[in-house]
Amino acid sequence: MDVSALLTSAGINIAICVVLVSLYSILRKQPANYCVYFGRLLSDGRVKRHDPRWYERFAPSPSWLVKAWETTEEEMLAAAGLDAVVFIRMVICSIRIFSIVAVVCLAFVLPVNYYGQKMEHKEVHLESLGVFTIENLNPRSRWLWVHCLSLYIISSAACALLYFEYKNIAKKRLAHISGSASKPSHFTVLIRAIPQSPDQSYSETVSKYFTNYYAPSYVSHLMVYRDGFIHRLMNETERMCQAIKHVSPDLSCNPSLKSCVLCGPAATNSFQIISNETDSVKGLELGELTLTTTEEERPVAFVFFKSRYDALVVSEVLQTPNPMLWVADLAPEPHDVHWRNLRIPYRQLWMRRIATLVGAIAFMFVFLFPVTFVQGLTQLPTLSKNFPFLKDLLNRRFMEQVITGYLPSVILVLFFYTVPPLMMYFSTLEGCVSRSQRKKSACLKILYFTIWNVFFVNILSGSVIRQFTVLNSVRDVPAQLAKLVPAQAGFFMTYCFTSGWAGLACEIMQPVGLIWNLIAKVIVKNKEESYETLRFPYHTEIPRLLLFGLLGFTNSVIAPLILPFLLIYFFFAYLIYKNQIINVYITKYESGGQYWPVFHNTTIFSLILSQVIALGFFGLKLSTVASGFTIPLILLTLLFSEYCRQRFAPIFQKYPAEILIAMDRADEMTGKMEEIHNNLKVAYSQIPTCSEESSKAGCTSPCSDQELPDSEELKPEKENLKADYIWEFQRSKSGLDLEVKSCPSASPIRNSPGFAEIYKRT
């Protein structure tokens, strides 16, 4: 690839970014798009719907950039939680590291590479990108010490910044733990693989076991029931309420003058009845509700203890000599529980993990074919030879630049859109009991997949057979990487343009949400001001951020021309991600900063990989002095990684007993323990309820990951048909085991069996 092809790709992507960002600055001002670009603020009720002047609404403005820049870390922590702060700290750490890397490499390494004597120089726009790489140096060049010294500076700066950031994030996590005093998960242990007894139920078995062995600390427990029936009933009832809500007020809000056989004549308003029923449900205490149906108990229970320390001890010790029974773990937060996966038998989990690992590896190798095809596009002689009918087209200068500089990265990015949903599906099949754990598992899978396919497969590709041939010679891996990385420097730059710059522009534009909102408002004619609240996609954005960090480290002393483009990406990411976090995405669950070890370990891996590649290149250039100095650098980096693992990693894996005991003593002194114990069953109940405050913002149950989609607007002539169908469906699902109270209205169309009628007071 030459400079003109690189500039063509950069120009196309810059134009795309400018257009999308300009459109965003206009579309975000339109009141009809508030639900797309201000979802989090709308859910908090903090957006005032006002129409600015017409000429201001259609003029691009950088006000959102100023707002994102001025948002402090404390504001983000209060609004979006610790995970959002940790993610922004990842971006900031990347900016700091690569600012130093860019200054060192652009000031010293790049001039040395460019003025090497191995390649012949041409006009600037016709220059091959190889003249900017270390390949342009002759063997035994006396300038290789510049690369070795730069590698030492880069490694020292990166390790120092990583250490201080790790220390800072660890303090934030400890503050997060001590600051969440009323979290029910600190008092709760999730017990799985409860043994079945022919003489008693699972609930009785749990009560007997913990009363026997943990009598001083055991409070109570809550069994997990088969969720299929409960969720279907709740979802259909919610849909019926949505359907009635969307009915035209002229037809639905008039008082009903029909008489009821049981209740007598009454002039009632159907919507007023539903409102009153909802208020009565909210008045019930969930701790007083039990299932009246014959729901099947699962061998899973939430067990509550008197103190945080008691729950911590129970979760850490082995309960029985058989480790496959009475498996105890600290429970996730109520809104973080993945209720559907709790029904998976514990003995199946290890088989599921193996199966998903095999499936992910198989998909990784299947993905070799599109990656190899993409690499074929970058080789014009091979492309002309295999497709003779394209020869005339490829001889045109502009088409050559587009095909070699822009098209390969676009095709690869499009193929990668299939990866996150599949990896999330694999993580769900693993049986993760919490949604944050599932998202972190998907993040790791996507990270490994991305590094393997974008970096290793691309630099080793010629054909699938040749890749296996190269990988068989493990001893020659550093030398092979040193030969192939400079050759792919141009592709990595164009991938930074397409996946990095243009990807961020698409992220802020939210094209899927915008199109969906347009369909709902224009085609479906939905006048309801509804919106879907989204969660931040850590499982896709963290791997992307780390991939560009890997490309920056591995190309720093080999092909430093990529560094300014990466810095632009990181600065752009800092502003856009902050804007999205404070305006668009909501936080219903989080991992407590557990993504930071992923960032730290991957950055260390990237740093060591860059040192190994440099070692291989010093060997190819026959520089024994530079090779000798690089080996101790690799060992020192490994020692630093091990120190950080011993010093900081346990903080992100376990809770410190010292902090939990201090929190227990503080709650005992203030008399909060009894209140916390009374709320434990309410928090982990499978029955969803809304408080007055949460109902204003659109409450969701702990069982659901996303809000229910709004029903389509009903036509007046189809009102009775739709309502009759829902009513009959509810009655058929209820069966004879449910006690459904009669409604004061004459028509069943205008009523729904509330949740208070499905359950009774104990």
Swiss-Prot record:
Keyword field: Calcium, Ion channel, Ion transport, Membrane, Transmembrane, Transmembrane helix, Transport
InterPro entries for this protein: Csc1-like, CSC1/OSCA1-like_7TM, CSC1/OSCA1-like_cyt, Csc1/OSCA1-like_N
Membrane topology recorded in Swiss-Prot or TrEMBL: Multi-pass membrane protein
GO cellular component, one term: membrane
UniProt KW tRNA-binding keyword: no
Subcellular location: Membrane
Family listed: Belongs to the CSC1 (TC 1.A.17) family.
Annotated function: Acts as an osmosensitive calcium-permeable cation channel.
Name of this protein: Hyperosmolality-gated Ca2+ permeable channel 2.2
The gene coding this protein: OSCA2.2
